[in-house]
Amino acid sequence: MSANKNDPKDAVKMTSGLDSQTQADLDALMRKYDRESNTRVWEGWQRWAVGAIMVIFSLYCIGMTLFYSGLPETRLAAFLAMIVFIGFLTYPVKKGHVKVNSMPWYDIILMLVGTSCFLYFAFNALPIIKLATRIQTHHVIIGAIGILVLIELCRRCVGVPILCVLGALLIYTFYNQLSYNPSLYQALKNIVYKLFYTTNGVIGTPVNVCYTYIVLFIIFGAFLERTGIANFFIALANRLAGWSAGGPAKVAVISSALCGMVSGSSVGNTVTTGSVTIPMMKKTGYHPDFAGAVEAAASTGGQIMPPIMGAAAFLMAEYMDLPYATVAVKAILPAVLYFTGIFISVHLEAKKLGLKGLSKDEMPKWSFLLQKIYLLAPLVLLVWLVSSGAKTMQFSAAVSILAAIIVGFLNKDERLTFKKIFEALEAGAKGAITVGVACAIAGMIAGCITVTGLASILINAIVQLAGSATFIGLILTMVCCIVLGMGVPTTANYCIMASTCAPILIKMGFPLVAAHFFVFYFGIVADITPPVALAAYAGSAIAKGNPMKTGINATKLAIAAFIVPYIFAYSPAMLFVNVTSVWAVIQIVLSALLGIFGVAAGLEGFMLRKMNLLFRLICIGGGLGLMIPGALSDLVGLVLIGGVFAIQYVQNKKETLSKD
């Protein structure tokens, strides 16, 4: 995995050219920990036929979002019809239940029936809208079947936990409707109408955002990956941090942050980037449990890394009614603190173990990296287009896709061929299935909450429970987000939390932006929080470590993700909200950085040298003090951490003098 000094191209080809057995092992890991990878196997002409359908879907999404401005219900129902069609083509009835070039008769029926239900709505949207609650019996049957087929597809590609949430809410909604009208048919009719035929259900805000923005950016990410930018990111990270103590771990942090931003998948990025970085970390001297944890924590953070954040960020922009560029800017400081926290932890671990960095022979030359800097052009163009606000997000994404294709053709080491273009469009469609289905189910969940008025009930209950103790409200919200996020995709988790918990925080007095960022962050960290820490378990499998210990280490490394949301909740200036002065923002960030350093040192048991339990507790306490708003708490925290630092500095000096 090292770069030859006589051939710097090797540094950019780190992840390419994997032998067939290694690639097979990685694919097996993906299937084990990433539900999206448990797909049917198509070979021969069938593989190309299915791929062609996927390509048509991607091209349809690009074309329709750019040029179609008709009835929203029509385009969203047609979008879900295609999602159902390619979804059943892709996902078998259960994990491992796959035969090559085989699709059972019942899957064909489900695919055709489900697609027909959504197409019926798409072609008859206007008359159905005019009928409103006066829909006929056949409308109810079609809508009910469409919902059931969508639920089955969700079970296959998203998972059961989100369906448990939906099931509980559907039962509650049914009884709620019966309280108004004792007729079972009328209750069912009302539920089907609101959840299938209105924008308070499957074609609600989540699916609208998915169709309008998310799918385009998934396709953009697929093209960007095929330009060779991931290899460039790893090589760049090697050049920037490989030389320092424990360099490979820092390389993992930087490269995973950059690659995770493009891939948008915690597990997927852990497996792909980790196949390079984890062996490097182990070779340097890091314990397997720690190496897997570093990769998992850094890959998970890719979803909060501007400018291309996770799919939930687009939903957040829609829910807050803010431009995506504004959301990305507000995410900068929390993301910096998150990755700085991981960086500090791996540095302290390296110092504690006495690890060295990579040699010059193992790092690429700056001259070669500069030759490949054009690979960043699509990202730079996207940032410029989005931040300028001159064009729509759809236009920005489409132009950036075109730029990625051009850049791919220019990269002679990993040139973008027509086959790769086909594969990128195919991968974009596959990536859209899970997100689209999750958004549709999240729309139904949000619809149930809206129809029943459950949000108001929950808001009043938690506000009364927490009273004036806003901190308790934050803790309750955090627990809800993490527990739900353990089995629910980030997009669906955010939609549910934005409909329930975010309004609670807003009613308690927290700013709108802070409330939504709070639930967004804690929905993401579930991927590294035991017992269901899928990204950590994937990292553990590559490192051949203990899954639970890897998960615990990943949680420790990502401690900033558990603390930073509380900081910006009480000090929203970190999100550029209610900013009184530039100095106020600088002060918040500096105290947060020192606080993260203190907590990381306490958890690692090392600052300038190994420390005992008392010093570790003092560091953690001091770090938390620095994160609590207020000059007094900052002063106390600074004194505590500074005291430990001074004592260890003197101890090191004495030890050096005694040796001399």
Task: Label the model's feature ranges.
Residues M1-T133, V140-A144:
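Conserved, well-structured core domains of diverse proteins
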Residues S2, D7-W48, V55, V329-G431, ...:
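Long, contiguous bundles of hydrophobic transmembrane helices that form the permeation core
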Residues T39, M64-Y68, T90-N101, P127-I128, ...:
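Membrane-water interface regions at transmembrane-helix termini and the short interhelical loops
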Residues Y68-S69, L126-T133, K189, Y193, ...:
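Membrane-interface helix termini and inter-helical loops of multi-pass transporters
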Residues T137-I141, N200-Y213, R239-V253, T284-F290, ...:
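Membrane-interfacial loop-to-helix junctions in multi-pass transporters
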Residues E152, R156-C157, P161, V165-P182, ...:
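Core transmembrane alpha-helical segments of multi-pass membrane transporters/permeases
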Residues G221-E225, S256-S265, A297-Q303, A446, ...:
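Transmembrane alpha-helix interface/packing and boundary motifs in multi-pass membrane proteins
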Residues I234-G302, I308, A312-L315, D321, ...:
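Hydrophobic transmembrane alpha-helices that form the pore/transport pathway of multi-pass ion
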